[in-house]
Amino acid sequence: MTADPGSSVPPAVVHRPVMVDRVVELLLPALGYPGAIVVDATVGLGGHAEAVVRAASAATLIGLDHDPHAIRLAAQRLAGYADRVQLVNVAFDRLAQVLSERGISAVAAILFDLGLSSLHIDDPARGFAYSRDVPLDMRMDPRLPRTAADVVNTYSATELARVLRVYGEERFAVRIADAIVRRRARQPITSTRDLSELVREAIPAPARRTGGHPAKRTFQALRIEVNDELGRLERTLPVAIAALQPGGRIVVLSYHSLEDRTVKRFFQAAASDATPAGLPTALPTARPRLRLLTRGAERPSPAEVAANPRAASARLRAAEKIRDTREAA
């Protein structure tokens, strides 16, 4: 994490927004008129938001984040644009409510930058890092009632195996789940180090030497479960498209295959004619709602990855709304 020399935010809280130039390039055509509204649904530390409001001088930005600390830091970073920025401390699945409360019927652009922010990764107290010995928390929103420790110590072996297999794509899910249940019968598992070492011991020795840290997939799975990451994304993508005005644009940055596949499936379905097979003519309400702006998922350049290794897993997809989904049949 390095500081932007042009920013007034302390270096410790400044991050490098991923693929920021491409994000701005894709959003800007929708933001060229006074009063255009762009939603940064995951404002985080404000890096993308700052670049967008700087480039789109007539636009207003609404930034959402479920982490109150992130909102405070983003407010610092965006202080110079305070007259054009509203920050709201809610998760992005409250998008419809946020717009309704402000009397906004449609927006020009929406950005989602999914996954962990630098703020979460770099704060050991959050319990996301398997390389540290800290409480097993993993909540992006500290107000959530359930921690990773709660999941590990209360889910059945079957439930744990499902979480690890589905959200972590962990091939040793059953072995790890059984090991967790045996260990917690003696003593609750409460720290990241305890869980990390347990996972390492549970999987076969040859597998420990390949594919990165042995606990990587387990930690990913627990994080997704605790924060309902995929559920929120699946619920919110249709809401986001409904909120876009025709000609509006949506950009999504994802960081693991489960997120990217969810976005890919949704975009492809919305960009396809949904007329049932066998009908003699296409249904007007089944016409494509989106036009894809990216050919597949775009990746960061080698230069960006070299400067910011955390960008390496990023996948970017974008689309433009071409039909008002609220039109009459």
UniProtKB/Swiss-Prot annotation:
Keyword Methyltransferase: yes
Keyword Transferase: yes
Organism: Acidothermus cellulolyticus (strain ATCC 43068 / DSM 8971 / 11B)
GO molecular function, one term: rRNA (cytosine-N4-)-methyltransferase activity
Reaction catalyzed: cytidine(1402) in 16S rRNA + S-adenosyl-L-methionine = N(4)-methylcytidine(1402) in 16S rRNA + S-adenosyl-L-homocysteine + H(+)
Gene for this chain: rsmH
Alphabetical keyword list: Cytoplasm, Methyltransferase, rRNA processing, S-adenosyl-L-methionine, Transferase
Basic and acidic residues biased stretches: 317-329
InterPro entries: RsmH, SAM-dep_MeTrfase_MraW_recog, SAM-dependent_MTases_sf
Role according to the record: Specifically methylates the N4 position of cytidine in position 1402 (C1402) of 16S rRNA.
Sites where the protein binds S-adenosyl-L-methionine: 46-48, 65, 92, 113, 120
EC number: 2.1.1.199
Name of the protein this chain belongs to: Ribosomal RNA small subunit methyltransferase H
Region (Disordered): 295-329
Subcellular location field: Cytoplasm
Top-rank EC class of the record's enzyme: transferase
Gene Ontology biological-process entries: rRNA base methylation
Family: Belongs to the methyltransferase superfamily. RsmH family.
UniProt cross-references to Pfam families, sorted A to Z: Methyltransf_5
PANTHER family on file: 12S RRNA N4-METHYLCYTIDINE METHYLTRANSFERASE, S-ADENOSYL-METHYLTRANSFERASE MRAW
Gene Ontology terms: cellular component: cytoplasm
